[in-house]
Amino acid sequence: MWFKNLLVYRLTQDVPFDAEALETALATKPARACASQEVATYGFVAPFGKGEDAPLVHISQDFLLIAARKEERILPGSVVRDALKEKVDEIEAEQMRKVYKKERDQLKDEIIQAFLPRAFIRRSATFAAIAPKQGLILVNASSPKRAEDLLSTLREVIGSLPVRPLTVKVSPSATMTDWVKTQKAADNFFVLDECELRDTHEDGGIVRCKRQDLTSDEIQLHLNTGKVVTQLSLAWQDKLSFVLDDKLVVKRLKFEDLLQDQAEQDGGDEALGQLDASFTLMMLTFGEFLPELFDALGGEEIPQGI
């Protein structure tokens, strides 16, 4: 269980996350299949294991792991548009009259309802780790919308969830730009070979570099003409690499072989043991990595009134 992306949320009040109570709460909204006329469903699933007896909360040391699954019927817009056009053309030809917006919208709804039972189904799972002692919730997602879906559903079942996206005092873009300009990152961080540069003007250009020497004159020229770094590939110690963006989203996390080998050794022969060991080691690594990342970005910003 290694997260590939990371969105970090700060609990703004102490929340007594009791594993047994949380298990009971999550069980009130289990994931389920879409009914024939449902567009989507959302609910909680066991993060590890299958079957009705698999727990919805996985506990390891002081960390809790939960997962939610979305099931949605996929109706391509082009299919609906083509069917609607065909129906409208048929009515206008047969009845010699114009089909206006209100009727067109009603026809569209009828077409969607007729197509839904035959639509393809897509399932996607989102994992979140709760670290009560650190006051953090870490979501394995690069999309804030996907993370908010999980957090709002968690809030729904437990009654209250005072949480906000973690922010830092210095703009990530300003820090990353400085690191590339000076060719030196903060202690324990190393600039790799990928970045995105954007002009600060609204309609300005974008330059994306991969497998590029970011110390080159070409990159420095872009920075000297006013572009800023909005994404940057980095490594931390010898433990992980990632891409950081200007919204403080950590993407394309890759844990180095050293950690993965250690988890494999700690986990034993059982699949569940392997998953538990990798989750625990990941969270302990985050416990070192995240404070250093936030410090490198000027420290955590605490909004007034919180």
From Swiss-Prot:
Question: Where, per UniProt, does this protein localize?
Answer: Cytoplasm, Nucleoid
Top-rank taxon of the source lineage equals Bacteria
One GO-annotated biological process of the protein: regulation of DNA recombination
Q: Name one GO molecular function term.
A: double-stranded DNA binding
InterPro entries reported for this sequence:
RdgC
What this chain does, per the entry, is described as:
May be involved in recombination.
| Annotated protein name in UniProt | Recombination-associated protein RdgC
The record lists the organism as Pseudomonas savastanoi pv. phaseolicola (strain 1448A / Race 6)
Gene that this sequence comes from = rdgC
